[in-house]
A protein has these predicted regions:
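Short, solvent-exposed loop/edge-beta patches enriched in aromatic
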Residues: 66-73, 79-82, 90-97, 117
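Small/polar-residue-enriched beta-strand and adjacent coil segments characteristic
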Residues: 56, 76, 93-171, 277-285, ...
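Secretory-pathway/luminal and periplasmic proteins that interact with or process carbohydrate-rich
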Residues: 87-88, 108-110, 237-240
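Terminal intrinsically disordered/low-complexity segments used for targeting and assembly
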Residues: 2-67, 115-117, 159, 243-288, ...
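Amphipathic alpha-helical coiled-coil segments
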Residues: 74-89, 172, 176-213, 228-231, ...
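Charged, alpha-helical scaffolding/interaction elements associated with membrane systems
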Residues: 68-69, 217, 422
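Repeat-solenoid scaffold signature
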Residues: 216-244
Length: 465
């Protein structure tokens, strides 16, 4: 008796079981990087809460920008395209089927013969008339076993690339929110400084006239006029800068909101208090939230999956196909003449080793490159966060130092006004102290703006809060 299974059939059965046992493998974790366990700067006392820092008008502007911005829309389209590629790659896991049908109408082979007399010679002539019809149909199915996870790793690479495209959306949204907040707060600071700058110009002009009169009376040297004139020119230039900067910030908002120029003119308000000092989580947890770090990590996952695909290309492939076809000139022929087929196809790479070696080395080089990119991204991200915290601390110290100057200027202006009212000092002297107070008030607004801009930059560097 012949054995039921030949050695080749046993080998094919074993390969089938092996192929069914493997599924899509998730990209493994890369080598852990040495990250600090704590931040260099002293921790804050407030839980990061970006939404709690926004007034309703700013929150509404951010929502409009997120809905209308073109950069976010383009990133979303790229992510959608990447998802479609993942779905196409996943189809390789499913059997592929095909159906075909055909119909023909050749000239009828039935013929008639008659004799024709040509020059006394009888020649038989055959003629064919009429048409015949025949029909056929076939159906087939094929399936490739993923013996070495080649298809699974190819899908994993596509999935990692799609997730990397998704991080672009998060990065764009984060950037837009930060830019809208910065433009809004800058516009608010400019609007708050404008009445102070106008009042300072009025005071300086009056001081200039009083000084000119005292110079004519011989009470002051002419050089004092030049000093006041320089102060007036600086005050007028500052007011012009405020107007120009306000227009530029409106243009920025127009671009972010996808609106026509000159852009919106909101009644912006700069927060009266300094921003809170945030208490950050562990560096590893914070870095994991950044879109650029996520993209770099996904790049490593995709490169690792591609390397595994290149390794699997070196091993045999096994696929199966089955088909059923039939046809004929009549309906009875369809049932009487079916043809079924089954085939197993084993492809073994034997003479293409040089190309496969180069392909594997290219994939390994790509993996090394993405690993270095991940390390570089982590180091730069860590330095960026620490730098933003240092800048925020510097802005806070500058604001505190100016608070002392503002208190001194306020007290000096109060005393000068009292002395002027009792005739102890001239009006020009009192106006100068009042101008110094306006300088300190404008500096306080600028330093408070700097603090909030640093807070926005810190929010962006943290990957959202």
């Amino acid at each position: 008796m012949k054995p039921l299974l030949t050695p080749l059939a046993c080998a094919l059965a074993a390969l089938c079981i092996t192929g069914c046992a493997h599924g899509p493998a998730a990209a493994p974790a890369t080598t852990d990087l040495a990250l600090p366990t704590a931040w260099a700067e002293r921790p804050g006392d407030a839980t990061p809460d970006w939404a709690g820092l926004l007034d309703p008008q700013l929150a509404a502007l951010q929502a409009r920008a997120l809905a209308a911005n073109r950069d976010i829309a383009l990133a979303a389209q790229r992510w959608k395209q990447a998802q479609l590629l993942v779905e196409q790659s996943a189809l390789r896991w499913s059997p592929s089927a095909g159906v075909s049908a055909n119909a023909s109408r050749p000239v009828q082979t039935q013929s008639s013969t008659r004799n024709v007399d040509i020059g006394g010679v009888t020649v038989p002539v055959t003629t064919a008339t009429g048409w015949s019809r025949s029909y056929g149909a076939s159906v087939g199915v094929s399936y490739e076993l993923d013996l070495w996870d080649r298809l699974a790793q190819g899908t994993a690479a596509q999935r990692a690339q799609a997730e990397a495209a998704r991080t672009d959306i998060a990065a764009a949204r984060l950037s837009i929110r930060s830019q809208v907040a910065e433009a809004y707060w800058t516009l608010a600071a400019l609007q708050a400084q404008r009445p102070l700058a106008e009042a300072q110009i009025t005071l300086t002009r009056e001081t200039l006239e009083l000084t000119r009169q005292r110079v004519r009376e011989g009470k002051l040297l002419p050089i004092e006029l030049d000093k006041i004139a320089v102060n007036l020119q600086a005050a007028e230039s500052r007011l012009a800068d405020l107007s120009a900067d306000a227009q530029l910030q409106r243009h920025i908002l127009a671009l972010l909101l996808d609106e026509p120029l000159p852009g919106p003119q909101p009644d912006a308000t700069l927060p009266a208090a300094a921003p809170p000092r945030w208490r950050l989580a562990a560096p590893a947890d914070v870095l994991a939230q950044r879109p650029d770090v996520q993209r770099a990590r996904l790049g490593v996952d995709a490169a690792l999956a591609k390397l595994r695909v290149s390794e699997a290309e070196r091993y045999p492939r096994l696929s199966f196909s089955a088909g059923l076809s039939t046809g004929g000139t009549t309906a009875s022929d369809w049932l009487a003449q079916p043809l079924a087929s089954f085939a197993a196809n084993l492809v073994v790479p034997m003479i293409d080793w040089q190309r496969l070696d180069l392909q594997r080395e290219g994939a390994r080089t790509e993996l090394d490159t993405t690993a270095l990119t991940l390390r570089d991204t982590l180091q730069k991200a860590l330095a960026d966060i620490e730098s933003q915290r240092i800048e925020a601390e510097r802005a806070a110290q500058q604001w505190q130092a100016n608070a002392g100057r503002l208190r001194e200027a306020t007290e000096n202006e109060r005393l000068a006004q009292l002395r002027y009212e009792v005739g102890a000092v001239a009006r020009a002297d009192w106006l100068q102290t009042r101008s110094a107070l306006l300088d300190a008030q404008q500096a306080e607004i600028r330093l408070r703006l700097t603090q909030w801009l640093r807070q926005s930059s810190l929010f962006k560097s943290l990957g959202g809060a």
